[in-house]
């Protein structure tokens, strides 16, 4: 019975063990599908299921018929034009990170948008070049393709060997196709959950480190220095060493241009951020500075007068598709997997933000398919891997973009540049593109502030951020990502391997039990210990669990058991020789000079000392906490009941089951009753299947709650001094109620407590 009285509640019910609860309340039989059942369901097909699959594979079929032309079209047009202009500039700039000519960045900004329009589930993200992925692809290109013209690479694009450029483009395209295939396979296999292994802290630390890599890699373009390309661990330090050893060769014109562009871009981005509510659209500062820089470079003939590096030849139209290299596949499978996972993680996290903001669903597996197909098409047409750039997606959303129609229109802008006006960008300095690339890193570089916030919230997450950053900086992006994931998983193991176990006590004299160290006024029944483990118990932490339990109770049950068995052997010898008598006042030893050989006892097999104590052959009972014969001393223990709170223990493995049963047996053999509370039915069923129970450890030790176990102990022990019992009421039945004012107490008008075992 449950009765609500104001802000209190009164509960009257029997005290239940898990076994008696199951006997009184029968569970319904549920049919659990087997693997064959799931296989049949996957292989079966109906018209309704086929329609559902088609709609999931092509989300455009769901939202395009419901498109509100009058309400959304104008906003999408404005957003598409703004996003397209940004995409053009970012494509050109991020191509430098891949170590290929800027023109190929336009392909990377065009093809993924087209495929995502049909296959994507997010309405607001802008798919295309992303600096972190561009940097990761560039690292692979640098490693696979050796540069024969490193010293003259920066002078002009025309000095680069055509076959060398084609080889770099082939590697970038092959890596992109392979990462797309990996994403497509993961999506088809419905394993989009892999992104959960990249926590927000890890992604933040990794992208911040990638931003540092981008910053360092662009120094050679901003200063126009002949810096060799490095791809091995510590490459960032080698690049910095090369830059500073050649700093006297800096092209002043490129340096001044870069600084001016960088300062102006940062200032106007701050203005856009601060006054975004007042501006109808963000100021397209990248476009404005690109137009100005191109005009000045062309009008003043910077290339000939100051020897600056320019974009150079921009062939109009598309190049024919290529077949990816299988050899590159074999050499870059690990890098491609990292690119695939990072690209999906970034895109999915940004898409999730907008889906929550505008209240529409996204499908992680379908996003994998969409990104995979996008990268496959992009790589086939000589583009490089993409995801979603935060700044570009922000432009698409902030300028009023409602659907991917805005993305399609942005692709039209890129298309116009590719087929018609790309040649106008030929005088543009590469240092300007480098400065624009750095201008888009502000958000990622600002993530350093996460360290302080994470330190206050969660030390483990803060450590993950710091170590991820260090790994990515020192080892490079590929190895750094792998090491970061491994470290993150290690922290999870560490948290479960060393859980914060605690001893609980009653708070408020009700059914509430909390860590007794956290409260001043607690009640802990004499001889009862409540121990809580807040994590799964498995092979790695069963030893830690046992040690913490021993620390909580204050003694080792195995040590007590062995000492009692040793003492029992001595008592048997004394009794057989007639040297001991049992009286109501205790033992009387008739020979004070009797001494047994400790060495003889110590040489007994340990297995015998670990067996249950058996006193049936003696004509008297032994009170191990009472007085024992002379020369026989063993530690006395006041504990008679131990409650293990397993409400947070989600699973046990086979190894830990054996260890747990051994621990329980040790306590039971020294007459300490053990109770386990808070487990679910599946937990107990698994123990039964694994033959956990025996004559000593039975399923009757399981109770629904801590309070059920406490009430059972109080009634079983029938305390004469407990505040829960009264010596004047020993002859009548005990009754309890839960009351927030008086706690557990006896009342004259009671609901009988039924103890069922």
Curated annotation (Swiss-Prot):
Which GO CC terms are listed, alphabetically?
apical plasma membrane; brush border membrane; membrane; plasma membrane; sperm midpiece
Q: Which residues carry attached sugars according to the database record? A: 149, 161
User: What does the entry give for GO biological process?
Assistant: cellular response to cAMP; intracellular pH elevation; membrane hyperpolarization; sperm capacitation
- Motif PDZ-binding extends across 754-757
The entry lists its GO molecular-function terms as: bicarbonate transmembrane transporter activity; chloride transmembrane transporter activity; chloride:bicarbonate antiporter activity; secondary active sulfate transmembrane transporter activity
**Residue intervals annotated with topology Cytoplasmic:** 1-71, 115-124, 198-201, 272-278, 357-367, 426-462
Where does it live in the cell? Answer: Apical cell membrane; Membrane; Cell membrane
InterPro entries hit by this protein = S04_transporter_CS, SLC26A/SulP_dom, SLC26A/SulP_fam, STAS_dom, STAS_dom_sf
Q: Which reaction does it catalyse?
A: hydrogencarbonate(in) + 2 chloride(out) = hydrogencarbonate(out) + 2 chloride(in)
Cross-referenced SUPFAM superfamilies, in alphabetical order? SpoIIaa-like (SSF52091)
Q: How does it sit in the membrane?
A: Multi-pass membrane protein
Q: How is it modified after translation?
A: N-glycosylation is required for efficient cell surface expression, and protection from proteolytic degradation.
Q: Which residues cross the membrane?
A: 72-92, 94-114, 125-145, 177-197, 202-222, 251-271, 279-299, 336-356, 368-388, 405-425, 463-483
Pfam families to which the protein is assigned, alphabetical: STAS, Sulfate_transp
List residues in topological domain: Extracellular.
93, 146-176, 223-250, 300-335, 389-404, 484-757
Where expressed (tissues)?
Answer: Expressed in spermatogenic cells. Expressed at high levels in cecum and colon and at lower levels in small intestine.
Predominant place of localization? membrane
What keywords sit in the KW lines? Antiport, Cell membrane, Chloride, Glycoprotein, Membrane, Transmembrane, Transmembrane helix, Transport
Function recorded in the entry: Mediates chloride-bicarbonate exchange with a chloride bicarbonate stoichiometry of 2:1 in the intestinal epithelia. Plays a role in the chloride and bicarbonate homeostasis during sperm epididymal maturation and capacitation.
Which proteins does it associate with, and in what oligomeric form? Interacts with PDZK1. Interacts with CFTR, SLC26A6 and NHERF1. Interacts (via PDZ-binding motif) with NHERF4 (via the third PDZ domain). This interaction leads to decreased expression of SLC26A3 on the cell membrane resulting in its reduced exchanger activity.
Q: Which family does it belong to?
A: Belongs to the SLC26A/SulP transporter (TC 2.A.53) family.
Q: What is this protein called?
A: Chloride anion exchanger
From which source organism is this entry? Mus musculus
| Gene this protein is translated from | Slc26a3
């Amino acid at each position: 019975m449950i009765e609500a009285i104001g802000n209190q509640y009164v509960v009257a019910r029997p005290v239940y063990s898990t076994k008696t609860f199951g006997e009184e309340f029968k569970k319904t039989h549920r049919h659990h599908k087997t693997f064959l059942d799931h296989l049949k369901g996957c292989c079966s097909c109906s018209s309704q299921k086929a329609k559902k699959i088609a709609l999931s594979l092509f989300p455009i079929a769901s939202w395009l018929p419901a498109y509100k032309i009058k309400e959304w079209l104008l906003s999408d047009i404005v957003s598409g034009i703004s996003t397209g202009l940004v995409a053009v500039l970012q494509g050109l700039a991020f191509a430098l990170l891949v170590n290929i000519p800027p023109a190929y960045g336009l392909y990377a900004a065009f093809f993924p948008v087209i495929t995502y329009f049909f296959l994507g589930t997010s309405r607001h993200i802008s798919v295309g070049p992303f600096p972190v992925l561009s940097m990761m692809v560039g690292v692979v290109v640098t490693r696979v393709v050796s540069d024969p013209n490193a010293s003259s690479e920066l002078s002009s694009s025309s000095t680069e060997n055509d076959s060398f450029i084609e080889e770099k483009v082939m590697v970038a395209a092959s890596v992109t196709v392979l990462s797309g295939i990996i994403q497509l396979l993961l999506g088809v296999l419905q394993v989009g959950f892999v992104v959960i292994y990249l926590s927000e802290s890890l992604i933040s630390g990794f992208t911040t480190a990638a931003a540092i890599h981008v910053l360092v890699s662009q120094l050679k373009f901003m200063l126009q220095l002949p810096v060799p390309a490095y791809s091995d661990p510590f490459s960032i330090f080698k690049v910095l060493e090369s830059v500073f050893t050649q700093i006297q060769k800096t092209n002043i014109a490129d340096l001044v241009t870069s600084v001016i562009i960088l300062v102006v871009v940062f200032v106007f981005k701050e203005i856009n951020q601060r006054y975004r509510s007042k501006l109808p659209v963000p100021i397209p500062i990248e476009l404005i500075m690109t137009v100005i820089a191109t005009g000045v470079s062309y009008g003043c003939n910077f290339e000939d007068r100051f020897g600056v590096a320019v974009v150079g030849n921009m062939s109009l139209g598309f190049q024919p598709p290529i077949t990816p290299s299988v050899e590159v596949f074999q050499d870059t499978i690990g890098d491609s997997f990292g690119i695939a996972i990072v690209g999906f993680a970034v895109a999915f996290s940004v898409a999730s933000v907008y889906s929550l903001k505008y209240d529409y669903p996204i499908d992680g597996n379908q996003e994998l398919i969409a990104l995979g197909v996008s990268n496959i098409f992009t790589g086939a047409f000589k583009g490089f891997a993409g995801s979603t750039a935060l700044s570009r997606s922000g432009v698409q959303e902030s300028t009023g973009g409602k659907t991917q129609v805005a993305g399609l229109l942005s692709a039209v802008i890129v298309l116009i540049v590719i087929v018609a006006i790309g040649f106008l960008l030929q005088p543009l300095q590469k240092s300007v593109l480098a400065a624009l690339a750095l201008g888009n890193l502000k958000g990622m570089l600002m993530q350093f502030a996460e360290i302080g916030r994470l330190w206050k919230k969660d030390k483990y997450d803060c450590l993950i951020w710091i170590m991820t950053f260090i790994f990515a900086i020192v080892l490079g992006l590929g190895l750094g990502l792998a090491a970061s994931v491994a470290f993150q998983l290690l922290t999870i193991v560490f948290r479960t391997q060393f859980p914060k176990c605690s001893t609980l006590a009653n708070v408020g004299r009700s059914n509430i039990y909390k860590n007794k160290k956290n409260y001043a006024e607690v009640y802990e029944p004499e001889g009862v210990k409540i121990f809580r483990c807040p994590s799964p118990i498995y092979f790695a932490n069963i030893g830690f669990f046992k040690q913490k339990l021993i620390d909580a109770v204050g003694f080792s049950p195995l040590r007590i058991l062995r000492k009692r068995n040793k003492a029992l052997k001595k008592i048997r010898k004394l009794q057989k020789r007639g040297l001991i008598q049992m009286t109501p006042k205790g033992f009387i030893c008739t020979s004070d000079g009797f001494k047994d050989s400790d060495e003889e006892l110590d040489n007994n097999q340990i297995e015998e000392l670990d067996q249950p104590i058996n006193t049936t052959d003696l004509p008297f009972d032994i009170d191990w906490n009472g007085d024992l014969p002379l020369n026989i001393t063993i530690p006395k223990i006041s504990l008679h009941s131990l409650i293990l709170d397993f409400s947070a223990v989600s699973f046990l493995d086979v190894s830990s089951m054996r260890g747990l049963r051994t621990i329980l047996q040790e306590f039971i053999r020294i007459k300490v009753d053990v109770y386990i509370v808070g487990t679910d039915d599946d937990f107990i069923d698994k123990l039964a299947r694994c033959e956990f129970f025996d004559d000593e450890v039975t399923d009757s030790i399981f109770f629904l709650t801590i309070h059920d176990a406490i009430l059972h102990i109080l009634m079983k022990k029938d305390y004469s001094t407990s505040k829960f019992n009264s010596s004047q009421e020993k002859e009548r039945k005990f009754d309890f109620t839960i009351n927030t004012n008086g706690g557990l107490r006896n009342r004259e008008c009671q609901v009988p407590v039924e103890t069922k075992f």
